[in-house]
Swiss-Prot record:
This is DNA-directed RNA polymerase II subunit RPB1. The modification Asymmetric dimethylarginine is found at residue 1810. The C-terminal domain (CTD) serves as a platform for assembly of factors that regulate transcription initiation, elongation, termination and mRNA processing. Belongs to the RNA polymerase beta' chain family. Residues 832-873 are annotated as: Bridging helix. It catalyses: RNA(n) + a ribonucleoside 5'-triphosphate = RNA(n+1) + diphosphate; a 3'-end ribonucleotidyl-ribonucleotide-RNA + H2O = a 3'-end ribonucleotide-RNA + a ribonucleoside 5'-phosphate + H(+). The modification N-acetylmethionine is found at residue 1. The tandem heptapeptide repeats in the C-terminal domain (CTD) can be highly phosphorylated. The phosphorylation activates Pol II. Phosphorylation occurs mainly at residues 'Ser-2' and 'Ser-5' of the heptapeptide repeat and is mediated, at least, by CDK7 and CDK9. POLR2A associated with DNA is specifically phosphorylated at 'Ser-5' of the CTD by CDK7, promoting transcription initiation by triggering dissociation from DNA. Phosphorylated at 'Ser-2', Ser-5' and 'Ser-7' of the CTD by CDK9 (P-TEFb complex), promoting transcription elongation. Among tandem heptapeptide repeats of the C-terminal domain (CTD) some do not match the Y-S-P-T-S-P-S consensus, the seventh serine residue 'Ser-7' being replaced by a lysine. 'Lys-7' in these non-consensus heptapeptide repeats can be alternatively acetylated, methylated and dimethylated. EP300 is one of the enzyme able to acetylate 'Lys-7'. Acetylation at 'Lys-7' of non-consensus heptapeptide repeats is associated with 'Ser-2' phosphorylation and active transcription. Regulates initiation or early elongation steps of transcription specially for inducible genes.
Length: 1970
């Protein structure tokens, strides 16, 4: 926990963290000891004579009262004193209302008289309970309570023969008797509660008849509890040390400190006391009264009254909402706020003040859009920026800048508000008279204003998912609103109609680093929720992109130039125009191709793509240009729209993110917007009323369609009137009618809509918005132009509101379209008043629905989060919760993160056996085919070698097994799966990078493929470990991916389809491995919260009310939010429980048999088949009253099989409905049998034949024989009979089951429409075939009985009632069912949520072995700590419970730590740093006293390395411009390689251009004399020949300032996708230009040094270094082992097999293939812009800085002797030998990125005080630098750049000369004697001191880029015989064999000056000396 307390007293070291919180009940003694008011508080008054009264309620000992006062106890003032407790001694004990229930429970468990436990603690059951409930005291009490419930006698000693329910073995018998329980053997009373009083009542009155019911006084209870022993306390679930039972009764009342109940002072009036003080006053008053009464011996009833009142007051102080009690009021009648109300609820203490607080350093204002900002920027108003501060610590590197800010003070922006001295003093600059007098020292803190480039968190409520809070970089802009890029509105769900957003400025560098690395917008582009981007191109840009990429868009030269101006990554080359004559024209697609980054490949379709185009002979040609193909970063064809640029999975943005990384994708967004929007300015887009008018023919069509629809409706109405309408099965007549009408009207709307759309021209602006996907849909168009359509309320047509009509304007019972809400006008035509009213009704419903839904889903989301908040991926990769229970063994069952997977198809699943064999089996018999696909020698090998053939057969076998496995996993044949590494796209990339010609045979040996894949799948490890379980787990986790891998990379497809070369295949395998490893979920990831958000967010989009979808006999199912609620609440009674019954065998196919089963299941009562019933008085059956029955009745009575005499004269006649009978397959006989079975002989039931015209049952009561005896009472009996018959009638109709299962009220039978319910079988040929089988769906569930029915498929039959599945099938089944149900709810409205989130929720709910509801009944019954529970719901109850049981909270979860202000164990907080204390000793002091160390520029303000105010649009716009030199611009190489570590930025032709930037760095583009490669003001690196490939230009170089908006200037010419090769004939490129020195290798893009691996240097380029014969990429002799391979790449290993510079053999993302360092991967720790030594915010990174410490990633212990303080370590020191083992060029610490190896400053020594990387004087491109300025050398006034003698390239010039100083007369380049071997040279010469002021690396003399290397320098001539790189004897400084030894300080094998590309070194030479 970082320092608490006020900021001034910040403790530097972290305070101790709280490990555990113990709860308990305070004992009276402890309360008294804790209290500061001796003798208790006796007076209800607060003051006496205006002074606080001692012993009163505002006792001065309890805390500070006045602002100015001090506390009498601790002498602290208002802010320091925390307040102190007092106490009141109560005259009589009272119950504590919070513990009342607990008190009763304990009372019921112990003997009323002797306080012994009612069950002996030796009872085995008790032992069992104790064992089971370890650590769960509450459970223990519950179990013991259940045991004691039945006991009503306290078991005594002797009677105790064996009262246990447990039989004891003989031996124990006497032992028990002897010891006994020692109870008193008396009867126990029942304990009852009424209000706040307890009563004891005895059921069994003992011999000495006691009174039945007594009032239990708290004293009595206190006595009983006191006598309970500690052991028994423990058995009762108490913790005797922290919570004894008698403490639950209040004897001493604590008085809360004053700070808890402050008084409010009103102006001029008396103090208003807090509610608690009022309450305490009441208690004190009544307590004093009670004590007085007791002393005076008042009557018992008076005292009882007083006690009752005291009890009431104490209770209402704790809880003022007690049921059955009056509220305690203030005089005004407002109920008092009790302690409980203070804590609970959203506004309460816990949720309102502890879990969520208001914070400082936040800002809020309205948002407005700004397309010119990058997506990760936010425009902040200057007024806000000047008010919010960031505390920056003063270091030697920022002291000048901060001093300047302090000088400006708070009044001007940018300035500072406070200085905090190192002793903690705060100086407020607002009130300081002369801020300029204040001097800073290192270690002070300056609270400076927010400025450009600061990192902030931006947030919009409601914060539904993590993309609602993202990190942005600040850009200060004028005016008062936040500005943000349009693309970011999607994740924030923001619009600009007045939304406000919040901004938080983080206050520590750690926080900033975390936000920058984890939460910046570009890193959030892809969401793990549904593995797709959440940001796309929106609105005008989207509309424009569609227009821009159409086939007919051509741009003139001027327009193209203008657009390229806005492309920040442009490299200065305009592509070849598509059309040359009559004048050059460029297409829109061409320009868009320049925006697309890197080598992206992508195939999508346009929104208007017709489906039938995908097959057939012309599938590759798209007539409407609707198929989008992006290949190698070029848009080949297709119109872009929302599908390719929106937020869908697989869009261009998504691929860019996955392939090129987040940084490049950020630029992609920005570039699309700037370029396209600027084109739209020229092109224009508007919409007017004219766009909504169609032609007259269309209107005619619309009229006709509506007329016909109305006609149809009238016909349907007539049919219904005439009873000709057949109800569809399962629907009533009315429903059927409504459905038909609805269908007719909806069809009419759709038809008119489509005709309206067809009539619109291609140029219609409505249409262009809809087609591009920017706004609106087809329905909107049709509503505007054609028909608004049917208005619905609750899913039905407008209901009748008045009597039988909707509005008084219509006639009654009008079912026509108009009267029931069909709007036949369009919006354009306008609505009639009635239409308008109906439309308003429909609209209003939508609004209400939304409002209600928001509250519902908000609560659901909160519950989800609370239930899973602490579920995280731990370091062993399991997913566990805060109490370390395993929830999942691997996250998502595959251990991968949601962001990095994508949809892929499993190739082997679908095809038939034949197709499968043809595609996957390597056919080595077909020689002709082999020769077409493989090279000759391979063909021979394959044909001749049986071993190879066996291997290939085995491979095919393996794939066949895979296919079988897949067909078990995906029985439906759905081959779309979510996997990492899109293999097909990676293969495509490989083909492009390696220029694979798919028509040439491949040199890839099939066996190499098989082996390679085998090896690879061994490397893809999700579960480490070698035991059988781990191996099994590993197989499960990677099964699908391995199958996918084997089927995609099988030898046959490699040879035939992909034709990869061997080298390409190796690249591919490495790439897959690295991508797979990057996809693994990070330990520390809070996947619980992630899952909760991912489910809660789509829930917000769901519909609330389930509209019953009008369909044919479909049953209604609950969907949407109500269903989600049912599922996570695990409701016992779902609204629509239902079974889906699948059938077996014949029944499934035969409708009749299926019908049989339907009848067997559907519950049928007599009522369902009855037409009518009647009761007749029919005394004489022979002549029955009902004439039509006479005939068949006679048949019965002729030969009666019953006693006719006993028959009752009353007759119940039931007429059955024949249709229903046949429908239900019932016979009369069955019914009669059922009746007889039910009533036996008491009823007589006769029935007619099944074929009779009417089916009739006649039922009579049979009177019992006794009735016959009592003739005289007959009349009464007759009366009774008919009443009795009535009862029987109703009973029979409703309760008598004829057939079926009671719970199943209705069964529907249908053929499935969707595939997932069809039966999928696999035919003989191995194809999937979906069969339609009858399935039954039921209303009501009874799974157990249905599964046991005959012909029901027990495997597939399923229920949607979760609880039922749990009871029938158990926990595993219910987990799967829950997952399926959730998936169904979410996917119903087309959302998709990645499986891992659903799975995690299901696992959370079921991992305990029972169903845990996501409600307080589930979540709060877990074993998590009380603090977590109380932050969810039932706050006070949870805390009381915890106190009573003495629980403790282990502080392992998230909520607990947040409450206590500690760092939660989440994300970066879940592990500790391991610091090697020994290594810290070798740190290095920075000399802080040397003047000039702080970099003061011309104005004294230096913004170079600090967040600079340079503009994002153009540096020229800002007043402070020194930092904004072009060198610092976006095209400084840093961005180039920043986009992809060391690879070509966007240049398609330079597939593996190691420089990372195209050769666009020509001096022509350098507006200042410096070279464009010259370092930025804060960069200590000088570009040098190897610079192109040197990792020093990685984004981690301080020159790359990710926070400098200047970093993205639109003129930045760094990438040119179309530059095929930079033609040296370009006019701006003249070799005579003084800046252009062909001999300065780092200085000419045509010089080979620009990336030897770059294929873009075509050998045809004339200036392609003809002097270096070995240097031609096509020359076979150029191999990586050739010594001329740049030694500047220190860790490059020439043995890397696949490295051949002629082939772009490495990919930016694959660590194994970066030529600059095999170990260099974007995930490697050194590749991180925030890595501590590289943090762009820490300008101090230089070897002189204390930060340059062994923990820096550059420094590794492999060079133990390197200590920055060691004076001998300096390249100039004689004992520095490159041959020394510690300095192997591969040593990671020896990397060109380290400033100490700036080879161009050979003598640079770390101890040189003057060397500061950000010294602005060191920028050749700095505006103030002019080569002609004679005085420009900060250290030597005599130095003149015009002197020819300063050319470091002069062969004679040796920087190692000790005398070398610009003033030394001895030095003359023409003096032939001058050579390092000259005797004057001795490193010990005193003059040679690296600190010598004349010898400062900052001196411009040392820039090889200095324009003075002029080719005219006579000594440096390429024609000089010495100067031939091929001359074997050539040595850079002197003839071979001279003492130029490796110990010479100037020589460094890694010095880029000696790189192969430097024409000044001989290949052999560099090799020998290496």
């Amino acid at each position: 926990m970082h320092g608490g307390g006020p900021p001034s007293g910040d403790s530097a070291c972290p305070l101790r963290t709280i490990k555990r919180v113990q709860f308990g009940v305070l004992s009276p003694d402890e309360l008294k000891r804790m209290s500061v008011t001796e003798g208790g508080i006796k007076y209800p008054e607060t003051t006496e004579g205006g002074r606080p009264k001692l012993g009163g309620l505002m006792d001065p000992r309890q805390g500070v009262i006045e602002r100015t006062g001090r506390c009498q106890t601790c002498a602290g003032n208002m802010t320091e004193c925390p307040g102190h407790f007092g106490h009141i001694e109560l005259a009589k004990p009272v119950f504590h209302v919070g513990f009342l229930v607990k008190t009763m429970k304990v009372l019921r468990c112990v003997c009323f008289f002797c306080s012994k436990l009612l069950v002996d603690s030796n009872n085995p059951k008790i032992k069992d309970i104790l064992a089971k409930s370890k650590g769960q005291p509450k459970k223990r009490l519950t179990h013991v309570y259940d045991l004691c419930k039945g006991k009503n006698i306290c078991e005594g000693g002797e009677e105790m023969d064996n009262k246990f329910g447990v039989e004891q073995p003989e031996g124990d018998e006497d032992l028990t008797k002897e010891k006994g329980h020692g109870g008193c053997g008396r009867y126990q009373p029942r304990i009852r509660r009424s209000g706040l009083e307890l009563y004891a009542e005895w059921k069994h009155v003992n011999e000495d008849s006691q009174e039945k019911k007594i009032l239990l006084s708290p004293e009595r209870v206190h006595e009983i509890f006191k006598r309970i022993s500690d052991e028994e306390c423990f058995v009762l679930g108490m913790e005797p040390r922290y919570a004894r039972p008698e403490w639950m009764i209040v004897t001493v009342l604590p008085v809360p400190p004053l700070s808890v109940r402050p008084a409010v002072v009103m102006q001029g009036s008396a103090r208003n006391q807090d509610d608690l003080t009022h309450k305490l006053a009441d208690i004190v008053k009544i307590n004093n009264q009670l004590r007085r009464n007791e002393q005076n011996g008042a009557a018992a009833h008076v005292i009882a009254e007083d006690v009752k009142l005291l009890q009431f007051h104490v209770a209402t102080m704790v809880d003022n909402e007690l049921p059955g009690l009056p509220r305690a009021m203030q005089k005004s009648g407002r109920p008092l706020k009790s302690l409980k109300q203070r804590l609970k609820g959203k506004e309460g203490r816990v949720r309102g003040n502890l879990m969520g607080k208001r914070v400082d350093f936040s800002a809020r204002t309205v948002i407005t859009p700004d397309p010119n900002l990058s997506i990760d920027q936010v425009g902040v108003p200057r007024s806000i920026a000047a008010n919010m501060t960031f505390a920056e610590i003063v270091t030697p590197f920022n002291i000048d800048r901060l001093q300047e800010l302090v000088r400006r003070g708070n009044s001007q922006y940018p300035g500072a508000k406070y200085i905090i001295r190192d002793n903690g003093d705060r100086i407020d600059l607002r009130f300081h008279p002369k801020p300029s007098d204040l001097h800073l020292q290192t270690g002070y803190k300056v609270e400076r204003h927010m400025c450009d480039g600061d990192i902030v968190i931006f947030n919009r409520q409601p914060t539904l998912h993590k993309m609602s809070m993202m990190g942005h970089r600040v850009r200060i802009l004028p005016w008062s609103t936040f500005r943000l890029n349009l693309s970011v509105t999607t994740p924030y769900n923001a619009d600009f109609d007045g939304d406000e957003m919040n901004l938080h400025l983080p206050q520590s560098l750690e926080t900033r680093a975390e936000i920058q690395e984890l939460a910046m917008v570009p890193r959030m582009i892809v969401t793990p929720q549904s593995n797709r981007p959440v940001m796309g191109i929106v609105q005008d840009t989207l509309t424009a992109v569609r227009k821009f990429t159409k086939r007919d868009v051509f741009l003139e030269r001027g327009e193209v130039m203008n657009l390229l101006m806005f492309l920040s990554t442009w490299d200065g080359k305009v592509p070849q125009p598509a059309i040359l004559k009559p004048r050059p024209l460029w297409t829109g697609k061409q320009i868009f191709s320049l925006i697309i980054p890197g080598h992206i490949n992508c195939i999508r379709t346009h929104s208007t793509h017709p489906d039938d185009e995908d097959s057939g002979p012309y599938k590759h040609i798209s007539p409407g240009d609707t198929k989008v193909v992006v290949e190698n970063g070029e848009l080949i064809m297709g119109i872009l729209c929302k599908k390719s640029l929106g937020t869908s999975a697989g869009s261009l943005v998504h691929i860019s993110y996955l392939e090129m990384g987040h940084d490049i994708t950020r630029l992609f967004y920005s570039n699309i917007q700037t370029v396209i929007n600027n084109w739209l300015l020229i092109e224009g887009h508007t919409i007017g009323i004219g766009d909504s008018i169609a032609d007259s023919k269309t209107y005619q069509d619309i009229q006709n369609t509506i007329k016909k629809a109305k006609q149809d409706v009238i016909e349907v109405i007539e049919k219904a009137h005439n009873n000709e309408l057949e109800p569809t099965p399962g629907n009533t007549l009315r429903q059927t009618f409504e459905n038909q009408v609805n269908r007719i009207l909806n069809d009419a709307r759709d038809k008119t809509g489509s005709s309206a759309q067809k009539s619109l021209s291609e140029y219609n602006n409505f249409k262009s918005m809809v087609v591009s996907g920017a706004k609106g849909s087809k329905i909107n168009i049709s509503q505007v132009i054609a028909v608004v359509g049917q208005q619905n309320v609750e899913g039905k047509r407008i209901p009748f509101g008045f009597k039988h009509r909707t509005l008084p304007h219509f006639i009654k019972d009008d079912y026509g379209p108009e009267s029931r809400g069909f709007v036949e006008n369009s919006y354009l035509a306008g609505l009639t008043p009635t239409e308008f009213f109906f439309h308003a009704m429909g609209g209003r419903e939508g609004l209400i629905d939304t409002a209600v839904k928001t509250a519902e889903t908000g609560y659901i989301q909160r519950r989800l989060i609370k239930s899973m908040e602490s579920v995280m991926v731990k370091y062993d990769a399991t997913v566990r919760n805060s109490i370390n229970q395993v929830v999942q063994l691997r996250y998502g069952e595959d251990g991968l993160a949601g962001e990095s997977v994508e949809f892929q198809n499993l190739a082997t699943l679908k095809p038939s056996n034949k197709a499968f064999e043809k595609k996957f089996r390597f056919d080595y018999t077909n020689e002709r085919a082999l020769r077409r696909t493989l090279q000759e020698d391979l063909v021979k090998d394959v044909l001749s070698n049986a071993h190879i053939q066996n291997e290939l057969e085995r491979e095919f076998e393996r794939m066949r097994e895979d296919r079988e496995v897949l067909r078990v996993i995906f029985p439906t044949g759905d081959s779309k799966v979510v996997l990492p590494c899109n293999l097909l796209r990676m293969i495509w990339n490989a083909q492009k990078i390696f220029h694979i010609n798919p028509r040439l045979p491949s040199d890839l040996h099939p066996i190499k493929v098989v082996e390679g894949v085998k090896e690879l799948s061994k490397k893809l490890v999700i579960v480490n470990g070698d035991d059988p379980l781990s191996r099994q787990a590993q197989e499960n986790a990677t099964l699908l991916f391995n199958i996918h891998l084997r089927s995609t990379l099988c030898s046959r497809r490699m040879a035939e389809e992909f034709r990869l070369s061997g080298e390409a295949f190796d690249w591919l395998l490495g790439e897959i491995e690295s991508k797979f490893n990057q996809a693994i979920a990070h330990p520390g990831e809070m996947v619980g919260a992630l899952a909760a958000q991912s489910l809660g967010e789509p829930a917000t989009q769901m519909t609330l009310n389930t509209f019953h979808y009008a369909g044919v006999s479909a049953k209604n199912v609950t969907l949407g939010v109500p269903r989600l609620k049912e599922l996570i609440n695990i409701s016992k009674k779902p609204k629509t429980p239902s079974l889906t019954v699948f059938l077996l065998g014949q029944s499934a196919r035969d409708a009749e048999r299926a019908k049989d089963i339907l009848c067997r299941l559907e519950h049928t009562t007599l009522r369902k088949v009855t037409a009518n019933t009647a009761i007749y008085y029919d005394p004489n059956p022979q002549s029955t009253v009902v004439a039509e029955d006479q005939e068949w009745v006679n048949v019965y009575y002729e030969m009666p099989d019953f006693d006719v005499a006993r028959i009752s004269p009353w007759l119940l006649r039931v007429e059955l409905d024949r249709k229903h009978m046949t429908d239900r397959k019932l016979t009369m006989e069955q019914i009669a049998e059922k009746i007889n079975a039910g009533f036996g002989d008491d009823l007589n039931c006769i029935f007619n034949d099944d074929n009779a015209e009417k089916l009739v049952l006649r039922i009579r009561i049979m009177n019992s024989d006794e009735n016959k005896m009592q003739e005289e009472e007959e009349v009464v009996d007759k009366m009774d009979d008919d009443v009795f018959l009535r009862c029987i009638e109703s009973n029979m109709l409703t309760d008598m089951t004829l057939q079926g299962i009671e719970q199943i009220s209705k069964v529907y039978m249908h053929l499935p429409q969707t595939d997932n319910k069809k039966k999928i079988i696999i035919t003989e040929d191995g194809e999937f075939k979906a069969l339609q089988e009858w399935i039954l769906e039921t209303d009501g569930v009874s799974l157990m009985r249905v599964l046991s029915e005959k012909d029901v498929d027990p495997v597939r039959t399923t229920s949607n009632d979760i609880v039922e599945i749990f009871t029938v099938l158990g926990i595993e089944a219910v987990r799967k069912a829950l997952e399926r149900e959730l998936y169904h709810v979410i996917s119903f409205d087309g959302s998709y949520v990645n499986y891992r989130h659903l799975a995690l929720l299901c696992d959370t709910m079921t991992c305990r072995g029972h169903l845990m509801a996501i409600t307080r009944h589930g979540v709060n019954r877990q074993d998590t700590g009380p603090l977590m529970k109380c932050s969810f719901e039932e706050t006070v109850d949870v805390l009381m419970e915890a106190a009573a049981h003495g629980e403790s909270d282990p502080m392992k979860g998230v909520s607990e730590n947040i409450m206590l202000g500690q760092l939660a164990p989440a994300g970066t907080g879940c592990f500790d740093l391991l610091l090697d204390a020994e290594k810290c000793k070798y740190g290095m002091e920075i000399p802080t006293n040397i003047p000039g160390l702080g970099a003061a520029g011309p104005t004294g303000m230096f913004f170079g390395s600090a967040p600079s105010p340079m503009g994002g649009i153009s540096p020229a716009m800002t007043p402070w411009n020194q930092g904004a030199t072009p060198a610092y611009g976006a095209w400084s190489p840093s961005v180039g390689s920043g986009m992809t570590p060391g690879a070509a930025g966007f240049s398609p032709s330079a597939a593996s251009d190691a420089s990372g930037f195209s050769p666009g760095y020509s001096p022509a583009w350098s507006p200042t004399p410096g070279s464009p490669g010259s370092p930025g003001p804060s960069s200590p690196y000088i570009p040098s020949p190897g610079g192109a490939m040197s990792p020093s230009y990685s984004p981690t170089s301080p020159a790359y300032e990710p926070r400098s908006p200047g970093g993205y200037t639109p003129q930045s010419p760094s990438y040119s996708p179309t530059s095929p090769s930079y033609s040296p004939t370009s006019p701006s490129y003249s070799p005579t230009s003084p800046n252009y020195s062909p001999t300065s290798p780092s200085y000419s893009p045509t010089s080979p040094s620009y990336s030897p691996t770059s294929p873009s240097y075509s050998p045809t380029s004339p200036s392609y270094s003809p002097t270096s014969p070995s240097y031609s990429p096509t020359s076979p002799s150029y191999s990586p082992t050739s010594p001329s391979y740049s030694p500047t790449s220190p860790s490059y290993s020439p043995t890397s097999p696949s490295y051949s510079p002629t082939s772009p053999s490495y990919s930016p993302t694959s660590p194994s293939y970066s030529p600059t360092s095999p170990s260099y991967s974007p995930t490697s720790p050194s590749y991180s812009p925030t890595s501590p030594s590289y943090s762009p915010t820490s300008p101090s990174y230089s070897p002189t800085s204390p930060n340059y410490s062994p923990t820096s990633p550059n420094y590794t212990p492999t060079s133990p002797s390197y200590s920055p303080t060691s004076p001998s370590y300096s390249p100039t020191s004689p004992n520095y030998t490159p041959t020394s083992p510690n300095y192997s060029p591969t040593s990671p610490s020896y990397s060109p990125t380290s400033p100490s190896y700036s080879p161009t400053s050979p003598s640079y020594s770390p101890s040189s005080p003057r060397y500061t990387p950000q010294s602005p004087t060191y920028t050749p491109s700095s505006p103030s630098y002019s080569p002609s300025s004679p005085s420009y050398s900060p250290t030597s006034p005599k130095y003149t750049p015009t002197s020819p003698s300063y050319s470091p390239s002069s062969p004679e010039y040796t920087p190692t000369s000790p005398k070398y100083s610009p003033t030394s007369p001895k030095y003359s380049p023409t003096s032939p004697k001058y050579s390092p071997t000259s005797p004057t040279y001795s490193p010990t010469t005193p003059k040679y001191s690296p600190t010598s002021p004349t010898y400062s690396p900052t001196s411009p003399v040392y820039t090889p880029t200095s324009p003075k290397y002029s080719p005219t320098s006579p000594t440096y001539s390429p024609t000089s015989p010495k100067y031939s790189p091929t001359s074997p004897t050539y040595s850079p400084t002197s003839p071979k064999g001279s003492t130029y030894s490796p110990t010479s300080p100037g020589y460094s094998p890694t010095s880029p000056t000696y790189s192969l590309t430097s024409p000044a070194i001989s290949p052999d030479d560099s090799d020998d000396e290496n």
